[in-house]
């Protein structure tokens, strides 16, 4: 991508993303920092919604089954692509790896995100506590959660109380999955920013996911599911911040060692905090997560610690792009 970036006019950069997930936050932040903005919608109905916002300059409808054409059009527009969960789900990790447009972050990490076993191996490489992973139902000796590969927002995940229930449920599955130990405690999702400009890992915020049939009004009548419908704000105990930052740094080092590229931009570690205050990480996202939407427009509680002013993640991305462009470091941000 470095050759494409060299051809870009740095005075006319555009920021683009798929019209979903965190697009409003990303594009609002980009416009605030003076960039042209492009939203790429799945269909015309979605496009109409995004066209109402003043900070979005152009709204396209794109063919996600053949994203290469859209990527080439983005390059012609001097655009930088910001990936998020809907991009991974709609376009697919294989197309995302090959899309010929500068893309924020460690693009190769998308391949690892698509495989739940590789994800857990990477967390283990980082020296971060993880839940037990069962390769076979015969190993199970307690409650477990079954999760599918890919960015699905929790859709289809289910809990089994033991081996017999698990074996019965697995017979109906037709896609790849992982069986993990079910953890008891408080869910907490940590937002980080890896900055090539400032040479640091920032703890930027945290959230709790609000999940249908787990957190909703079911009164015990509905089977638990884990479809994410929104996110709740979370301010962590200050005594937890050093270990959370340490895990973020260790993860970044493991990515560089095992995946072969440096983290750049936002990422997330997803965890359970147990009653002894220990943290077990069961998932990661190598790009911006929807939980950052909780402080859109008024800034994360930790952004003031780094910049002495409130900043949301969309603004943080735009800030890094602006400073990287000035310093000639865009090729450290985009792959």
From Swiss-Prot:
- Indicate whether Manganese appears among the record's keywords: yes
Return the InterPro entries for the record.
Answer: ATP-grasp, ATP_grasp_subdomain_1, IMP_biosynth_PurP, IMP_biosynth_PurP_C, IMP_biosynth_PurP_N, PreATP-grasp_dom_sf
Looking at the record, the residues that make up the ATP-grasp domain are 107-315
Residues recorded as binding ATP, renumbered to this chain, are 137-189, 211
**Which Pfam family would be a valid example here?**
DUF1246
Q: Which reaction does it catalyse?
A: 5-amino-1-(5-phospho-beta-D-ribosyl)imidazole-4-carboxamide + formate + ATP = 5-formamido-1-(5-phospho-D-ribosyl)imidazole-4-carboxamide + ADP + phosphate
User: Which residues of the sequence carry a binding annotation for 5-amino-1-(5-phospho-beta-D-ribosyl)imidazole-4-carboxamide?
Assistant: 21, 86, 231
Record-listed E.C. numbers: 6.3.4.23
> What positions does the entry give for Mg(2+) binding?
270, 283
The protein's required cofactors = Mg(2+); Mn(2+)
Q: Which GO terms describe its molecular function?
A: ATP binding; ligase activity, forming carbon-nitrogen bonds; magnesium ion binding
- Signal peptide residue numbers: none
Cofactor binding notes: Binds 1 Mg(2+) or Mn(2+) ion per subunit.
Q: List the keywords (alphabetical).
A: ATP-binding, Ligase, Magnesium, Manganese, Metal-binding, Nucleotide-binding, Purine biosynthesis
The metabolic or biological pathway listed in the UniProt record of this protein is: Purine metabolism; IMP biosynthesis via de novo pathway; 5-formamido-1-(5-phospho-D-ribosyl)imidazole-4-carboxamide from 5-amino-1-(5-phospho-D-ribosyl)imidazole-4-carboxamide (formate route): step 1/1
Annotated GO biological processes are: 'de novo' IMP biosynthetic process
Q: Which family does it belong to?
A: Belongs to the phosphohexose mutase family.
| Function, in words | Catalyzes the ATP- and formate-dependent formylation of 5-aminoimidazole-4-carboxamide-1-beta-d-ribofuranosyl 5'-monophosphate (AICAR) to 5-formaminoimidazole-4-carboxamide-1-beta-d-ribofuranosyl 5'-monophosphate (FAICAR) in the absence of folates.
Protein's recorded name: 5-formaminoimidazole-4-carboxamide-1-(beta)-D-ribofuranosyl 5'-monophosphate synthetase
Species source reads Pyrobaculum arsenaticum (strain DSM 13514 / JCM 11321 / PZ6)
